[in-house]
């Protein structure tokens, strides 16, 4: 907020655009883009937008995730290789924000799935602590159910699937 508390500046991101700064006047409709750090690069590349998915895990628990397909994705041209990306934590979470790594994989022709299994933040205390004392159990089921969901709904080559992760996601 400004010192007069009538303006706010904030960062905006999405799966197909890195963060930029915006400002808005309180009580007004609309906002104003303050930065364009990424505009020159974005004018030269095609970045796909991730699709949000909700799918049931083995026990029926609803899990949120995102699927990012290669630019120009055409199911008839598939099947495509798949990469499962697992976040750190376990008390971390993916969101609808720009992820260079996922965009890089998609640009190389892979479908990328990244999910928020049990243990992730943002879904309540029960979801967060469901894996306490059991890392790699329910959360493992959740990410594998996400892979099954993507294989069933996108043109995926089941002989070319891989997994990547960092910190807890590499566990």
Predicted regions and their residues:
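Serine-hydrolase catalytic core recognition
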Residues: 1-171
């Amino acid at each position: 907020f400004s010192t007069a508390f009538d303006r706010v500046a904030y960062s905006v991101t999405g799966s197909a655009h890195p963060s930029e700064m915006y400002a808005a006047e309180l009580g007004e409709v609309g906002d104003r883009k303050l930065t364009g750090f990424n505009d020159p690069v974005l004018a030269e590349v095609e970045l796909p937008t991730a699709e949000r998915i909700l799918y049931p895990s083995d026990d029926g628990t609803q899990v949120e995730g995102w699927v990012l397909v290669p630019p120009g994705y055409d199911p008839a041209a598939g099947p495509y290789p798949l990469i499962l990306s697992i976040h750190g934590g376990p008390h971390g979470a993916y969101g609808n924000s720009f992820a260079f790594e996922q965009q890089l994989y998609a640009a190389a022709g892979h479908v990328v799935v990244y999910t928020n299994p049990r243990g992730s933040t943002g879904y309540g205390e029960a979801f967060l602590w469901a894996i306490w004392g059991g890392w790699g159990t329910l959360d493992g089921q959740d990410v594998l159910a996400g892979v099954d969901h993507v294989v069933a709904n996108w043109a995926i080559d089941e002989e070319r699937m891989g997994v990547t992760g960092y910190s807890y996601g590499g566990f």
